[in-house]
Amino acid sequence: MDKRVFTAFLMAFIIALASCSMIPLAFAKLDSSRPPDIEQVIFIHFVKSKAKPPSEETGYYKLIGAKWQTFPVNLEVNPSSSGLSQDFVIKAIGMAAEEWDSGAYSQLEGIAWYGVAPDLFNDIIAITDKGYDDLAWTSDKLDGCNTIVWGNYPTGGVIAVTILWYNKATKTIIEFDIVLDTDYEWDNATQGLTVMDLQNIVTHELGHGIGLGDVYQSTAYQETMYGYSYAGETSKRDLYIGDKKGITKLYGAA
């Protein structure tokens, strides 16, 4: 077999292995009558212009009351409608996911942080053809896949939306889906301050997907989980004090 053909075949095989459809789905294909222990949370990420930085903070975080129990968490993405190349999208999402795994192994405000104990996210991100209407807006759309797509959310001023489902009895996250709004231009904001930075926003949304809520204190503006963003922002790419405290509270330190 030609080396290039073999390489292409191998990559396709690896992507197929990463597909969430191969994961046992305890809660897949639920009907429209929501099971009593299954709860939905929708996080809406609004745009807000950059404000003057307030005084320093010591680390805000908010837990939603559920977390993943099995790892790694698989991701899939449909890069169509993004206006970006598939390679760029995969790389940006991969870097966002890795930030929650390792947080760049930093020393910050006297806190030595070396990531969390489990390897949270699968390093391989699958490609899907699912769209906005295929996401788990209702329980009958649950499929065990954590899907990222671009779409037009009906409310103005919304950058992204994360839909999360969890089991109230076991406090276990079942699935999350992310919509990145097509009202905005997406790219690398270090090369253009008028765009929404893909890595920046996805890092925030993945925080919801693994169990963290938004924080809105004015002094929490440096946190990845601060609930507002703006075009050109890149600070959410890097976890801050509260983000690291929160994720360590959920999953333990490495």
PLM regions and their residue ranges:
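Secretory targeting signatures
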Residues: 1-28
